[in-house]
Design a protein with these regions (language model features):
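Short catalytic-loop micro-motif centered on adjacent basic/acidic residues
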Residues: 15-16, 46, 113-116
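GST superfamily/GST-like fold recognition
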Residues: 112-124
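Glycine/small-residue-rich phosphate/adenosyl-binding loop
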Residues: 25-99
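Short hydrophobic alpha-helices that are characteristic scaffold elements of the AMP-binding
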Residues: 105-108
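C-terminal helix-cap and adjacent tail motif
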Residues: 3-20, 25, 140-170
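A glycine-rich helix N-cap at a beta->alpha junction
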Residues: 68-72, 130-152
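Residue-level "edge-of-site" marker
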Residues: 46, 120, 139
Length: 170
């Protein structure tokens, strides 16, 4: 499958089966995150892999992870991030989002589904998972095999703004 069709057919899955994700597939997903580009190659991503029942239950007490059998808590190390000198913008959110996108795309290519989650209180996650202060919780990528009907890839013609509303040539 070419890249365009891969991303066109990817969707946010919110119903996962109980089937565990194979260890070698988890490693491959994490490897894709490792090779994702980051500003000045600073690699500020720090990823907590939660696949044990106890850890997943703790996380699900403060964030809806849709009963996924695997959750990646994507954090950024505030001490290992590039900052643009002109306006002091740090790239922590950008870098970790690129890493997450790479992992999410690889997940789909392996037949595993995902949902990117940002609706949570980061301080609660830091507390229950004992995350150190130098790490900022950015997002959660919940992963698993789908237990729902795959939506049509034609949905984008109705759900997305036309290109001429989001892109400008000058």
């Amino acid at each position: 499958m070419d890249f365009f069709n891969l991303i066109k057919n990817r969707y946010s899955c919110r119903n996962f089966s109980e089937k565990e994700i194979e260890k070698e597939k988890i490693i491959k997903i994490l490897e894709c995150g490792k090779i994702a580009p980051t500003a000045c190659n600073m690699q500020p991503q720090r990823i907590l892999v939660l696949n044990e029942k106890n850890s997943l239950e703790k996380l699900s007490s403060v964030a809806n992870i849709y009963n996924a059998p695997l959750a990646l808590v994507i954090c950024g190390d505030k001490n290992s991030v590039w900052t643009r000198p002109f306006d002091k913008k740090n790239t922590l959110d950008i870098d970790t989002s690129i890493v997450t996108t790479y992992m999410m795309s690889e997940t789909h290519s392996l037949g595993i589904k995902s949902v990117w989650i940002c609706f949570f209180d980061p301080s609660q996650i830091k507390t229950i998972l004992n995350i150190p202060n130098n790490l900022e919780v950015i997002s959660i990528l919940a992963l698993g095999y789908s237990d729902e009907k795959t939506p049509s890839s034609d949905r984008y013609s109705q759900e997305r703004l036309p290109l001429n509303k989001t892109t400008f040539f000058k």
